Amino acid sequence: SVTPAQFTEHMDYLRDANFQVLPLAQALADIRAGKPLPDKAVAITFDDAYRNIYEQGFPILKERGFPFTVFINTGPVEQGNKSFLTWDQMREMQRFGGEFANHTVGHPYLLRLEQGETVEAWWSRITHEIEQVETALTTQLGESPKMLAYPYGESDAQIQEYVTDRGIIGFGQQSGVVYQGSDFANLPRFPAAGHYAKLATLKTKLNAKPMPLID
């Protein structure tokens, strides 16, 4: 959804415009603790465990020394799907600033019950989707950053409460700036791929400020 040439252009802009690319988990911890971030702080995320992140994106990031986070769905990884990352590739990326977080096992639309499924069975399935990835991250990569990107960006109050109770930070796909007053059960992110890959409009997003609402 973004070409290597476009991605290189984005990364060169971050470097040339003196953005401070930070590890996502550490940046969020600092925000919540009230610790100031550097000026022009930004974090880079990918959703899904596609192998082209390793083949196309990782060399560009490594060359510039930029940390990044990949939210992985572990189902195709465990199945050995050739289009998805391997655990060994993830371990290599970890050594150069890669961080891997939860995107569920099978990338389901979390709010949809399957045909004939009860609410109780749906809830058991959804919590299993989340918990199984947390276990896999710890077992395979030695740690989990306790972050979850909701598949398709969708969640509800029950899922968000469940995530929060387990110390996990949730991410949607709605646009916005993260700041101390953000909802850490459903944080926003700016898209930078597909229709949103054009650098001219991406610059506006990267230079945006939060606008807290009092009422």
What are these regions (language model features)?
Residues 24-27, 71-73, 103, 173, ...:
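Conserved beta-strand termini and adjacent loop/short-helix elements that scaffold enzyme active sites
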Residues 46, 167-176:
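Acidic, His- and aromatic-enriched active-site or binding-groove loops in soluble protein domains
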Residues 154-171:
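Short, electropositive alpha-helical surface patch
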Residues 1, 17, 32, 37-42, ...:
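Metal-dependent polysaccharide deacetylase catalytic core of the NodB/CE4 family, i.e.
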Residues 155, 175-208:
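A cross-kingdom marker for long, charged
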